[in-house]
Amino acid sequence: MKPYRIALYNLTTTTKSGGIETFQIGLARALARRGHTVHLYGGEPSAGFLPPQGVEVRTYPFIPRQRFPDLGTRFRKFAERLSFARHAGKDLVRGKYDLILVSKPFDLPALLRASRCSGARAVFHSGGTEFFPGYGLLVRRLDRFLACSAHNAARIREYCGVEPQVLWNGVDTERFRPLPRNGQLAERYGIREEEAVTVSACRLVGLKGIRYGIEAVRMLADEGCRVKYLIAGGGPERPRLEAFSRELGTTGRILFTGEFPNDQLPELYSLAAAAVFPTVGEEAFGISIAEALSCGVPVVATRVGGIPEVVPDGGGLLVPPRDGTAIARVLREWLPDPARRRRMGEAGRRHVEANFSWDRIGERFETLTGLAQ
């Protein structure tokens, strides 16, 4: 297959970290490894941004959304993206690209204009349901329309009658891999050899449902189970969750690590007997769940959104949302059975390698967008 010139365009790829940003960087790296020329477009970067190997990064100024009049969230997002396109758009047209990919619907006008002026294929990979008037008209003009899960594709079809093809998010399986127990980290958090550890790694917002994980651990502790729950991440819900933990009398059982670097999460998962993701809101995919599975940790997660597509039979279990009792029931079975947890961890790892590795995602991207023809 001949190499192509590809632009991945997303303002926040270079200014923050999250699922969309991880996807853009991971796909850029995967496509570069497959021989393509890849340019990553983003806003003027924040400190600490590391360009992916083999990828040229192009950054441009923009006006932060907070500086625009508060005429609604959608207005501010559009205005911010248009301010970015004002600086980046010319290079996007002049870059002689074969394909341009965006990951946010607010970039669709800039994408379609660049495609019309340059002849590049216009591709949108949806990671959520940020709908707005005119969304359906814009996506009908795309050359390829992709979604991060079958659930997300179905939600889009319900909204505008157009169903994208599915391209799951990817996981860096070289970084997220099973590791030996990190004794220094265990010592830092006061974890003893005989204690079972459960982990949740996510942003602490209401839709992540962490209070139900806390409830489950309280139930297990009341039964005499020697368990600790590490909650890795920051966010506005942390003070309320800490207060809730104190109310339940779980002080010493529940440990809030604060912000935890993504590239160090495998070390945290090396302590885990299980990972808990008690999501209660819309989750288009569940990248944190896939990362835990890739580290060989069995997962208990909720049956919402695209999460069932991530959790394999034999590698984890799904429970109803808002049900701490169901989470406790699963952990009660798993924690005393290391052989079962090991088998589940191996099954989860195989599932991620087969479906979500970046080599696999890069290959499927080429097929879905017509580059493999």
Model-predicted regions and their roles:
Residues D313, L317-G324, E333-A339:
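Conserved acidic donor-binding segment of nucleotide-sugar-dependent glycosyltransferases
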Residues E80-F84, V102-D107, S126:
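Short His-centered aromatic/hydrophobic patch
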Residues E259-F260, E267-A272:
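Short alpha-helical donor nucleotide-sugar binding micro-motif in glycosyltransferases
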